[in-house]
């Protein structure tokens, strides 16, 4: 195991040295990220090697690295399944007319009209607020 990890390190180091000079800056950033990930993988591979040495501080059950890596994947898959995509339903205008029973008993359609005198709230109904304040002061 130790020789395999050391071989992986030299391979990564060779990749870094060979690609640093010939790759544009944006690709260099990607390579740095990959090299950092490789370093983390090397550190993780070294941890079980150190824990294999017998000693008073060793645990009876070492944590399995594979099961720890699988758990985030399971959470991501389950969260993807729970996402509900909203559906947009396109409809057209309705041809229905509302019929209300009034005291007069007529079935004719009515238009809702705004009262002409709004009192102190009139200034909010005008298109220009400056005109609303001027007309309020004159009254």
From Swiss-Prot:
Using the record, list the residue span of the signal peptide; answer none if the entry has no such feature.
Answer: none
Q: Name one Pfam family in it.
A: DUF4609
List localization entries: Cytoplasm, Cytosol; Nucleus; Cytoplasm; Mitochondrion
Q: What is its main location?
A: cytoplasm
Say which domain of life the source belongs to.
Answer: Eukaryota
Q: Which residues carry this modification: Phosphoserine?
A: 94
Task: Point to the regions of Polar residues compositional bias.
Answer: 97-109
Record key words, sorted: Autophagy, Cytoplasm, Mitochondrion, Nucleus, Phosphoprotein
Q: Does the keyword Phosphoprotein apply?
A: yes
- The keyword Cytoplasm is assigned to this record: yes
Give me the stretches of Basic and acidic residues compositional bias.
Answer: 25-50, 110-120
The role this protein plays is:
Plays an important role in sperm motility and male fertility. Required for sperm midpiece flexibility and for the localization of sperm calcineurin to the mitochondria. Promotes mitophagy as well as acts as an autophagy mediator in male germline cells. Links damaged mitochondria to autophagosomes via its binding to the outer mitochondrial membrane protein VDAC2, as well as to key autophagy machinery component ATG16L1.
Tell me how this protein assembles: Interacts (via PQIIIT motif) with PPP3R1, PPP3R2, PPP3CA, PPP3CB and PPP3CC. Interacts with VDAC2. Interacts with ATG16L1 (via WD repeats).
What is the name listed in the Swiss-Prot or TrEMBL entry for this protein? Spermatogenesis-associated protein 33
Record organism: Homo sapiens (Human)
């Amino acid at each position: 195991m130790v020789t395999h990890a050391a071989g992986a390190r030299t391979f990564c180091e060779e990749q870094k040295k060979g690609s640093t000079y010939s790759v544009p800056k944006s690709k260099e950033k990607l390579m740095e990220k990959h090299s950092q990930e490789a370093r983390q993988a090397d550190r993780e591979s070294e941890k079980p090697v150190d824990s294999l040495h017998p000693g008073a501080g060793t645990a009876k059950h070492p944590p399995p690295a594979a099961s720890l890596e699988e758990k985030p994947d399971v959470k991501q898959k389950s969260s993807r399944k729970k996402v509900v995509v909203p559906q947009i339903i396109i409809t057209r205008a309705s041809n229905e007319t509302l019929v209300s029973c009034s005291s007069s008993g007529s079935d004719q359609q009515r238009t809702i009209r705004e009262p002409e005198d709004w009192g102190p709230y009139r200034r909010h109904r005008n298109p220009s607020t400056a005109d609303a304040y001027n007309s309020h002061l004159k009254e």
